[in-house]
């Protein structure tokens, strides 16, 4: 399937908050991303999936202002972004909490204040269920609690856009599902937009209003799925099965092409 020239917000959602244009992104002589045009509306969650090495994390770094060396533009609410911005929150695969600071000081790190009581930090910790551990150090938290602290830190300063790079891949299945539901709650409550990079197809279909499939060599949008399933979603909803099969077929195609085997070995058994 050929790349889409422009990926628009889901029908019925407000005008775009984010307008991303990547004509080309190079690493040395290799083209990592090419011909990407993506718009995301406020209140919308877009999930990005694709095989390893297709440029998913690079795309997030560009939007976050951490990788300015590309041909194109990033516009947020009509204003060009040329570097990191308080209007864009980032949540990584690992919590990356500073071990010598309390949970509260980690969440409010960008403010520069330490040791005091910040009402906005206290509100965020309460929102993610960590009000009782504000003065504890990161080493005392479970993996799921640490990632909730990272979500609170990403929300500090009331960003308009939240970027998440495989945020729940390092926790167990039940914790992952709880964190996914927490993410949906905070995106809805704060009326922000979110882009989630994930390798988990079920996670993408549960979280996303849209799912973008990136093809590799170079990274480009190969397919877009509108997830027209009402929220709150049931993870067992059979209407998600056909969309999941479509994503699996795309992954099989990419892997077979990379291996030089057009027939390939089926992912599912007969």
UniProtKB/Swiss-Prot annotation:
- Family annotation (PANTHER family): ALIPHATIC SULFONATES IMPORT ATP-BINDING PROTEIN SSUB 2 (PTHR42788:SF19), TAURINE IMPORT ATP-BINDING PROTEIN-RELATED (PTHR42788)
Protein family according to the UniProt entry: Belongs to the ABC transporter superfamily. Aliphatic sulfonates importer (TC 3.A.1.17.2) family.
Known role: Part of the ABC transporter complex SsuABC involved in aliphatic sulfonates import. Responsible for energy coupling to the transport system.
Record's keyword annotation contains Signal: no
Matching SUPFAM superfamilies? P-loop containing nucleoside triphosphate hydrolases (SSF52540)
Ranked from the top, the taxonomy reads: Bacteria, Pseudomonadati, Pseudomonadota, Betaproteobacteria, Burkholderiales
Protein name in UniProt: Aliphatic sulfonates import ATP-binding protein SsuB 2
Keyword terms of this UniProt record: ATP-binding, Cell inner membrane, Cell membrane, Membrane, Nucleotide-binding, Translocase, Transport
Q: Which reaction does it catalyse?
A: ATP + H2O + aliphatic sulfonate-[sulfonate-binding protein]Side 1 = ADP + phosphate + aliphatic sulfonateSide 2 + [sulfonate-binding protein]Side 1
């Amino acid at each position: 399937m050929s790349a889409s020239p422009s990926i628009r917000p889901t029908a019925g959602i407000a005008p775009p908050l984010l307008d991303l244009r990547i004509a080309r992104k190079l690493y040395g002589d290799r083209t990592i991303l090419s011909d990407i045009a993506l718009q995301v509306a406020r209140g919308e969650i877009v999930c990005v999936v694709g095989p390893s090495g297709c440029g998913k994390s690079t795309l997030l770094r560009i939007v976050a202002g951490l990788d300015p060396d590309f041909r194109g533009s990033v516009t947020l609410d009509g204003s060009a972004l040329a570097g990191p911005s308080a209007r864009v929150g980032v949540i990584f695969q690992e919590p990356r909490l500073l071990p010598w600071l309390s949970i509260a000081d980690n969440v409010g790190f960008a403010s520069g204040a330490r040791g005091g009581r910040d009402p906005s930090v206290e509100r965020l910790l309460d929102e993610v269920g960590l009000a009782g551990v504000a003065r504890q150090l990161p080493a005392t938290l479970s993996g799921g609690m640490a990632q909730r602290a990272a979500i609170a830190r990403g929300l500090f300063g009331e960003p308009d856009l939240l970027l998440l790079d495989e945020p729940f891949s390092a926790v167990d299945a039940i914790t992952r599902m709880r964190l996914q539901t927490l993410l949906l709650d905070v995106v809805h409550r704060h009326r922000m937009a979110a882009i989630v990079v994930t390798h988990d197809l079920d996670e993408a279909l549960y979280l996303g209003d849209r799912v973008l499939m990136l093809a590799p060599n170079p990274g480009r949008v190969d397919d877009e799925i509108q997830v027209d399933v009402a929220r709150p979603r049931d993870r067992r909803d059979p209407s998600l099965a056909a969309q999941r099969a479509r994503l699996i077929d795309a992954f099989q195609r990419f892997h077979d092409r990379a291996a030089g085997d057009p027939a390939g070995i089926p992912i599912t058994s007969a």
